[in-house]
Amino acid sequence: MARIAGVNIPDNKHTVISLTYIYGVGRTTAQKICATTGVNPAVKIKDLSDEQIEQLRGEVAKFTTEGDLRREINMKIKRLMDLGCYRGLRHRRGLPVRGQRTKTNARTRKGPRKPIRK
């Protein structure tokens, strides 16, 4: 297994699909990485040379991925909560942030139903 950005990439899958195993790299980004490095997206990782894998590593390193991306997202959410803005309050209360209705639905965000106390 090749290791790119601290993630073990599966050998028996196509390059584009394997790159999506990295947090922060989707299909579109993986295709762009393959295009800039000149690697054929249909070739499997096990068939790539060490030089090509190094090129992929270098190109992936230009993007914010894995732990850095997770940290960045959490810091942005924390900043909203510290500001006390509407979106921050919604995050703090565990409710939908982007204007969805909550009278019905929103069960995923709110969690399981709580029984009514008498």
Swiss-Prot record:
PANTHER family: 30S RIBOSOMAL PROTEIN S13/40S RIBOSOMAL PROTEIN S18, SMALL RIBOSOMAL SUBUNIT PROTEIN US13M. Belongs to the universal ribosomal protein uS13 family. Gene3D superfamilies: 1.10.8.50, 30s ribosomal protein s13, domain 2. GO terms for biological process: translation. SUPFAM superfamilies: S13-like H2TH domain (SSF46946). The keyword Iron does not apply. It comes from the Bacteria. Pfam families: Ribosomal_S13 (PF00416). This is Small ribosomal subunit protein uS13. HAMAP family: Ribosomal_uS13. Part of the 30S ribosomal subunit. Forms a loose heterodimer with protein S19. Forms two bridges to the 50S subunit in the 70S ribosome. Located at the top of the head of the 30S subunit, it contacts several helices of the 16S rRNA. In the 70S ribosome it contacts the 23S rRNA (bridge B1a) and protein L5 of the 50S subunit (bridge B1b), connecting the 2 subunits; these bridges are implicated in subunit movement. Contacts the tRNAs in the A and P-sites. Residues 93-118 are annotated as: Disordered. Keywords: Ribonucleoprotein, Ribosomal protein, RNA-binding, rRNA-binding, tRNA-binding.
